[in-house]
Regions:
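Catalytic pocket of metal/acid-base enzymes, prominently hydrolases
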Residues: 1, 44-46, 194
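Short acidic/histidine-rich active-site segments
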Residues: 4-8, 24-30, 46-66
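Short acidic active-site motifs
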Residues: 11-12
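Distinct, well-ordered alpha-helical segments
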Residues: 35-42
């Protein structure tokens, strides 16, 4: 792989960036590792392979704290320069995902952007979508189109009717033992373990 958002420690991030991998520092509702990852790579001179991401944020978290703008604020709090933090969440992340028309203000790029009055607080004063002003000072200006996505559409997944026994797990038993994969929780960091 050439990208990883599973680094939990400064050492892991440093090793991966030294190997030329893209490293994502994530701040989700349950995993917060921006500070740890940043502390491992902050002495690099070249940050094009460093990205900021959320991975998963709950709706309540987004409502009260924001989304990627909140992750950028966290990176700045931990010592990252504001412009480098913004670039890590926009252009670097777009490049990582192979989205060549996102992440910058340039001809041929999608004109989705926001304006802020303070590079450290990152509270949007104006929001543009497809080149049009859609929100200003916290007020929605654009009309919202009602869209319908019927579940019975032609491209839907068709599943037979399920019963309780369909959810019973029948693991392979070897010498009276079963191998189980677990998710372990380490102080705001999830880790997969065997």
């Amino acid at each position: 792989p050439n990208t990883c958002h599973e680094s939990r420690t400064a050492e892991e991030a440093l090793e991966k960036m030294r190997s030329g991998m893209r490293v994502d520092a994530r701040d989700s509702s349950i995993t917060k590792n921006v500070e740890a990852i940043w502390s491992g790579v902050k002495d690099f001179r070249f940050f094009d392979n460093f990205c900021l991401c959320t991975d998963d944020r709950e709706a309540d978290d987004i409502l009260h704290n924001g989304h990627i703008n909140d992750v950028v604020r966290a990176a700045i709090r931990y010592g990252m320069e504001p412009v480098a933090a913004i670039k890590s969440a926009t252009l670097n992340s777009a490049r990582e995902a192979g989205l060549q028309n996102l992440g910058a203000v340039a001809p041929g790029y999608a004109a989705d952007m926001l304006l802020v009055d303070d590079l450290r607080e990152l509270r949007p004063s104006h929001v543009f979508y497809a080149g049009k002003l859609v929100a200003q000072e916290g007020r929605l200006l654009a009309e919202i189109e009602d869209k319908s996505y019927p579940l019975e559409s032609a491209n839907s997944v068709h599943v037979r009717k399920l019963a309780a026994e369909d959810f019973t797990i029948h693991p392979p038993v070897s010498q009276g033992k079963v191998k189980v994969n677990l998710m372990k929780y380490y102080d705001m960091n999830l880790s997969t373990t065997d």
